Every structure is written in C-alpha cells, then in structure tokens.
C-alpha cells in the first residue's frame, strides 16, 4: 500500500495552508486534505473506511479555556464525543497507533476544557486497557501526550503577550503564582512522533 498522509480539519483556511506547505516542502508525500468535523460520525466512518489509516494523530479540540467556560456543551460535543467517535473507529478499522494530544490543564482539572480533555484521556486509557485485557477485540495502541504552551502554535499565549506589550501593557496573567511551561513546535512534533 502506498504511503500517504490524510489531514482532517474543520477549519478550512489552516487546512488549505497545510496543503500548500505539503506541496511545497514534502511533494514526495501524497497529502489529502479533508474538511470535516470529528463529531460527524458518518463522515468519519467514511474517512476511516476509505483510507484505512495505520496511525491517527488526534489533535482536534477546542482549547481556549474562557470560551469553553462559556460554552461547556461544545467542549463535550467536540472534545469528548469527537474523541470517542474517532477512537472507536480506530479500533474498528485496525489502526496500529492512536496518539491523542492533550493538555497540561488535564492534570487535576479546574476548568471545563481541562475536564473535557481529562475525560478524553480516560476514555483512551480505558479503551487501551480493554484491548490489552481482551475485553475489546482490536490491536490499536492508545497513547496520550500532554502539552503546555507551544510557542508559535494557534492559541499560544505569546501573541497575546506581544499585543499587550505593543499596546503599552499590562500583561494579563491568570494568577501571580502560575508557572507556564513552553516548548517549540519541533519539540512538540518530536513528542507526538515518539
């Protein structure tokens, strides 16, 4: 079977940007870009059936804490239900490895977004254990990786800080004792691919 990369996102513009970047930098790797929501079960089933992926890197999520505090139902629908849909499909279609990108906010969560990601982690962990214990038929290995702040990524706090400094400050911090952990995009990529 020919290797190819299938990239799925529901945000059209970033998906188009990825397509152009892949053509420019990695023209030897066929890259399919599909606009779809992970919460759309029938569409996701079609994607898994048609492309039969060996690996799934699941980074889809609503991640802005204040937005999810105001829209908790969306955190449940997109983050939790979307994860359940594609994790179950990964098992059904024999994906070798399912890597879920989570957040440091899932550690002892104190907000809706962190809680939603912790539930996603728990679902993937329990599915992995059920496969290992023979309670669920499958071969998929589930792995979760947690990130803090990824410099240069969408939603990073750095652009907010830059804008606040440009406008004369002050810099907004959620708590004076908070410690923020940062990594670069290449470091995040290496962590996901381990």
Where are these regions (language model features)?
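A short helix-to-beta-strand connector/capping loop
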Residues: 26-31, 138-140
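Hydrophobic/aromatic anchor residues within beta-strands of the central parallel beta-sheet
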Residues: 33, 75, 98, 142-145
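Short, small-residue-biased leader/transition segments that mark boundaries at the very start
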Residues: 2-7
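Conserved residues in the N-terminal Rossmann fold of short-chain dehydrogenase/reductase
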Residues: 34-35, 77, 175
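Conserved Rossmann-fold NAD(P)-dependent oxidoreductase catalytic core, especially the SDR/UDP-sugar
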Residues: 58, 62-122, 126, 132
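Conserved Rossmann-fold cofactor-binding substructure of NAD(P)-dependent oxidoreductases
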Residues: 35-55
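NAD(P)-dependent short-chain dehydrogenase/reductase
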Residues: 88-91, 112-194
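Helix N-cap at the beta1-alpha1 junction of Rossmann-like dinucleotide-binding domains, i.e.
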Residues: 11-14, 38
């Amino acid at each position: 079977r020919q290797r190819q990369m299938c990239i799925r996102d529901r945000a059209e513009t970033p998906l188009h940007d990825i397509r152009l970047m892949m053509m420019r930098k990695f023209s030897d790797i066929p890259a399919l870009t599909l606009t779809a929501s992970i919460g759309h079960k029938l569409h996701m089933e079609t994607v898994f059936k048609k492309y039969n992926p060996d690996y799934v890197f699941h980074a889809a999520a609503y991640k802005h804490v204040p937005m999810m505090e105001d829209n908790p139902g969306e955190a449940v629908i997109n983050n939790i239900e979307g994860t359940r849909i594609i994790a179950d499909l990964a098992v059904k279609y024999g994906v070798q490895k399912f890597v879920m990108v989570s957040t440091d906010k899932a550690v002892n969560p104190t907000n809706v977004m962190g809680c939603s990601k912790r539930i996603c982690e728990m679902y993937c962990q329990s599915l992995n254990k059920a496969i290992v214990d023979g309670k669920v038929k499958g071969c998929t290995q589930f792995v979760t990786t947690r990130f803090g702040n990824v410099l240069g990524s969408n939603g990073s706090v750095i652009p907010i800080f830059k804008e606040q400094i440009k406008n004369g400050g002050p810099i907004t911090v959620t708590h004076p004792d908070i410690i923020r952990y940062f990594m670069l995009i290449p470091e995040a990529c290496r962590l996901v691919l381990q």
